[in-house]
UniProtKB/Swiss-Prot annotation:
The record marks 103, 125 as: Interaction with substrate tRNA. Monomer. It is an enzyme of class 2 (transferase). InterPro entries: Dimethylallyltransferase (IPR039657), IPT (IPR018022), P-loop_NTPase (IPR027417). The lineage of its organism: Bacteria, Bacillati, Bacillota, Clostridia, Thermoanaerobacterales. ATP binds at residues 12-19. This is tRNA dimethylallyltransferase. Its EC number is 2.5.1.75. It comes from Desulforudis audaxviator (strain MP104C). Substrate binds at residues 14-19. Belongs to the IPP transferase family.
Amino acid sequence: MTVPPPLVVITGPTATGKTEVGINVALACGGEIVSADSMMVYRGMDIGTAKPSASEMRGVPHHLIDVVDPDEEFNVARYQQLAGEAIVGILGRKRVPLLVGGTGLYIRSVVEDYRFPVRADRRLRNRLQEAAELYGCARLHRHLAVVDPVTARRLHPNDQRRIIRALEVYYQSGIPFSRYPDRRDRAPKYLPVMFGLNMERGRLYRRIEDRVDAMIRAGLVREVQSLLEKGYGPELVAMKGLGYKEIAAHLRGSLTLEEAIHILKRNTRRFAKRQLTWFRRDEQIRWLDVEECGGPVGAAREIVGSIEQE
């Protein structure tokens, strides 16, 4: 039996330093990074997504960054395909693939080799979106609870995009989304070596607030204004990302800048908490406290040491 190739995964909640740690690990072990961030795939959305600059990448090849325009559809199935192709290329160059980011579903789709049940049906999706607008997303969530209670319990009643996707799967296949992916009787594609970065909650929240302030100073308002002027409206999935929806609301006059910043910090803290809840369920992840490791360089050193022992 062929031993699957190793895949190093570095994940954790936002603002824990995953990007910097990943770059340091890649430099130490001859690796290339495959981004696992659902917002970094969009071109022109740089400040609000905390994309690393060319100088910050320090010569480390990065994949799955700047893949599509903000008005193009991009989903986990497409991510899985492109990430898989990138990993094959990295392995072919005899280098180490590192999956780095905080989008749990993207990571799981690669590590667990998801089999996606059905392709998106544009007409069905439009009908479900119209129903959500007419009756409210909570009503769709209640319906999902009838046909797929497992998925309904996992999703927030206002998570319209994922609720609609789960209903799409059910209506098209007759099978609840919670029964996918089915990877039984299949050999694993990779041997995942997974690390989670974290830190004391108060420290993490202060880092989140400092990062939001830094984004504002770096020109986040100008970035969002430019996107809106190019015709990328607030209804787009990309424009509903953290930082973009709050600043867009400010630019429409719904919020003052101070209010938008306050809400963005609050929403990011809540997002980090949800990320941590998601990742804590994965027993494969080895957790590292970045502060206890002495910062990103120390955390990278710990990871490299663990990889060498595998």
